[in-house]
Amino acid sequence: MKKSSLALMMMGLIASSATQAAEVYNKNGNKLDVYGKVKAMHYMSDYDSKDGDQTYVRFGIKGETQINDDLTGYGRWESEFSGNKTESDSSQKTRLAFAGVKVKNYGSFDYGRNLGALYDVEAWTDMFPEFGGDSSAQTDNFMTKRASGLATYRNTDFFGVVDGLDLTLQYQGKNEGREAKKQNGDGFGTSLSYDFGGSDFAVSAAYTSSDRTNDQNLLARGAKKAEAWATGLKYDANNIYLATMYSETRKMTPISGGFANKAQNFEAVAQYQFDFGLRPSLGYVLSKGKDIEGVGSEDLVNYIDVGVTYYFNKNMNAFVDYKINQLKSDNKLGINDDDIVAVGMTYQF
């Protein structure tokens, strides 16, 4: 394989973890793909709860059926299993589980556990070898990342009229009966992105608004509606990847005792893919809480990330990722300020 071909392959692989799916069935308009990875990883940190083995296995299935010339049905399921637990400790979790239909030139609609609309922007900077993407995106935190009860409409190239213009409309149903910080009321979200084609630049923006549950409103910090908006910019060409994101959340970002009334979030990443498989990475993540009861302003997340990944081929890589924590040791919310170094190898298919 030519070196330039290897670099192009790595760029495509990084852009979508699911591109490595192996086709196991394709007949009579029905197709089934499987994908997954084993990430053998160790954390080194003075923070005891983070220090040690972090190995996990991730597995997914994607299927589709051709109903007619214009209509396609599809579904996806993805799960994760911890590799650092005892055999008697059940640690499986469902990451994604949704099904829907796609109409030619009109977009797709699906329902289930999926990615929130705000993550359409946040995903551009969630590219570090291990860390990153955690200033405002958190699992089961309204529509900032993976969440349940999402009805999602997606349209690419805006009905076939504008190349590179993608639209998402999303509704999230109420989720109660769980930890208050993981709950949500009814909400909606939207995102819009535009790829400038020959320039290799893209811009995106997203907005979400949700009711908060009664349990959430009883917490000491945060009240009323939860809202967020985000905007991002990326450049992806010539073996270079650059991306930045800014977002604001209101009564949405979880902290000790409830939610921050406001959080301002910034992320940036720069990476270069060498022809021989090496990919260095430099990034920065900041989330600053504002108007917090009894606290005022305080950094919630603040770190520099330095990492490197070496791709042996499209299926195997080794990495080191160093999270250099910039939080103050005496921060008023008691957030841990220790550094973390992640070292590991990943096999994916």
Swiss-Prot record:
GO terms for molecular function: porin activity. Its main location: membrane. The keyword Signal applies. Keywords: Cell outer membrane, Ion transport, Membrane, Porin, Signal, Stress response, Transmembrane, Transmembrane beta strand, Transport. The gene is phoE. It is a multi-pass membrane protein. NCBIfam families: PRK10159.1. Uptake of inorganic phosphate, phosphorylated compounds, and some other negatively charged solutes. Induction: By phosphate starvation. Belongs to the Gram-negative porin family. Homotrimer. One of its GO terms (biological process) is monoatomic ion transmembrane transport. This is Outer membrane porin PhoE. GO terms for cellular component: cell outer membrane; pore complex.
